[in-house]
Amino acid sequence: MKTVLVTGVAHGIGKAIAAKLSEKYCVIGVDKELPEHIFCDTFYQCDLSNMQELQETIIQVKNRCESLYGLVNNAGIFIHKPLKDQNILEWEKIIAVNLTAPYVLSQALSPLLHHGHIINIASTRAYMSEAGTEPYSASKGGMVALTHALSISLAGSVSVNSISPGWINTDESYVATVEEKAWHASGRVGKPHDIAKVVEFLLEDEDGFITGSDFVVDGGVSKKMVYP
């Protein structure tokens, strides 16, 4: 069975990705928190903002696996506060988790990914944003750029793509309003499994022709004019 490593598996999109992939793949999960429901064959607890912990986890993965079929850089953190109230420590932590860790993991594990896949979970905030999300938006814009750069550096060996989700409702108790649904051409907000299905699709491209691309999965909200 092919092995796929997924970061950020404890909640939300990462949890859905791990659950979906566990149907076909051996899943290695990495997260700072212990998942309530583990859909992983192997789990490593790691704070991705801590470089020492990250390097130790990479060593453990290399000792366990001779090869990987996929690396899904999903883990991410988000803050939403006025620009004047943000601080450099928040910036550094968001960049560390959302951008530096995917770079380090991709660099370290790409030799194990011969004819495999790297899939980065970015965000539509790489293209459009709102006030108070500067660190997060910058990190996700960087992830899209990292994706196409890696696709060139690893050309012929590893396919590298990113997925940019829009509004994905990761709170099962939240019910979107009629207005919020109407913002989307799809008529609803996204669900974590919407992203998991795209990850599965990209992993099934065994010929590796799909590479260097970003897939916007937002129910059409970024294409629909919404007037206040």
Please tell me what each predicted stretch does.
Residues 184-195, 206:
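A conserved structural motif in NAD(P)-dependent oxidoreductases
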Residues 128, 200, 211-228:
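Short C-terminal tail/terminal secondary-structure segment
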Residues 10-11:
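Conserved glycine-rich cofactor-binding loop
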Residues 123:
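Residue(s) in the substrate-gating loop at a strand-loop-helix junction
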Residues 106, 139, 147:
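Active-site helix of classical SDR
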Residues 111, 151-156, 208:
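Alpha-helical segment proximal to the catalytic Tyr-Lys
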Residues 82-83, 90-92, 180-181:
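Substrate-binding pocket helix/loop in short-chain dehydrogenase/reductase
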